Curated annotation (Swiss-Prot):
It catalyses: indole-3-pyruvate + 2 oxidized [2Fe-2S]-[ferredoxin] + CoA = (indol-3-yl)acetyl-CoA + 2 reduced [2Fe-2S]-[ferredoxin] + CO2 + H(+). The lineage of its organism: Archaea, Methanobacteriati, Methanobacteriota, Methanomada group, Methanobacteria. This is Indolepyruvate oxidoreductase subunit IorB. Transmembrane segments: none annotated. Catalyzes the ferredoxin-dependent oxidative decarboxylation of arylpyruvates. It is an enzyme of class 1 (oxidoreductase). Signal peptide: none annotated. PANTHER family: INDOLEPYRUVATE OXIDOREDUCTASE SUBUNIT IORB. Keywords: Oxidoreductase.
Length: 196
C-alpha cells in the first residue's frame, strides 16, 4: 500500500520533527519511506513543507493530486497545498492563524477562516479543522502543537502507522523531559480529530 503525506506550516511549528517521527516509525516497521523538505525563511515564520511517501514509491515528491493526507499546521499554508489535493484527500487543519511576514506589510488582509475552509472542502474529500494551539496549551506547552497534529494524523482512517509505532518514534526523537506533555498532546490531538 502506498500513502502520501504532505505536511505544511510555518517555521518554528515543528513540521520537520513531525515528519522525521513519521518516517522513523515507518522504517522501524520495515516499511519503505522517502521524504523531502522545503524550508522557507524559518526564522521569520516562512513556509515549511515536507512530503512523506510511504510504500513502493519512486521519488520523494508527491505528484499533484496524489496526497492521501494533508497535515496543515496553518490555514493559509493549506491553501498553498491545494495542488497536492484531490477529492480523495483527507485534510487535517490547525485553525489557529499565523499571518505570514509578507502579509503583515501587504494591503491584502488574511482571508477569513470560513473562506479557507470552504475552498479546502471544495477540493478535498474530507476536511477536519480544530484549534491545535489551544489543545497544545492545555496539554502543557505550545510547542507540543506538532504532536497534537501527529495524533490527529494517527486518527485518520487509512493512516498506515499505528499510534504505538508513532509513540515509540516520539520517545526516540523528543527530549525525555518533555515526553509527558507531548504524549498528552498526541492523545488529545487523536481525540480532537476523531470528534471533528
Amino acid at each position: 500500500m502506498n500513502y502520501n503525506i504532505y505536511v505544511c506550516g510555518v517555521g518554528g511549528q515543528g513540521i520537520i520533527k513531525t515528519s522525521v517521527i513519521i518516517g522513523e516509525a515507518a522504517m522501524k516497521k520495515d516499511i519503505n519511506v522517502v521524504m523531502s523538505e522545503i524550508h522557507g525563511m524559518a526564522q521569520r515564520g516562512g513556509s515549511v513543507s515536507t512530503e512523506i511517501r510511504i510504500g513502493e514509491v519512486h521519488g520523494s515528491i508527491i505528484p499533484d493530486g496524489e496526497a492521501d493526507l494533508v497535515l496543515a499546521f496553518e490555514p493559509l499554508e493549506a491553501i498553498r497545498a491545494l495542488p497536492k489535493m484531490s477529492e480523495e484527500s483527507e485534510v487535517i487543519l490547525n485553525t489557529s492563524v499565523i499571518p505570514p511576514f509578507n502579509l503583515m506589510r501587504s494591503p491584502h488582509p488574511y482571508p477569513p477562516l470560513d473562506e479557507i475552509m470552504s475552498t479546502l472542502e471544495e477540493r478535498a474529500g474530507s476536511v477536519r479543522g480544530f484549534n491545535a494551539e489551544e489543545i497544545a496549551l492545555k496539554a502543557g506547552h505550545i510547542l507540543s502543537l506538532n504532536m497534537v497534529m501527529l495524533g490527529a494524523a494517527a486518527a485518520t482512517p487509512g493512516f498506515p502507522l499505528e499510534s504505538e509505532s508513532l509513540i515509540s518514534s516520539m520517545r526516540d526523537n523528543l527530549p525525555s523531559r518533555l515526553i509527558d506533555v507531548n504524549l498528552r498532546a498526541f492523545r488529545d490531538g487523536f481525540g480532537a480529530a476523531a470528534e471533528s
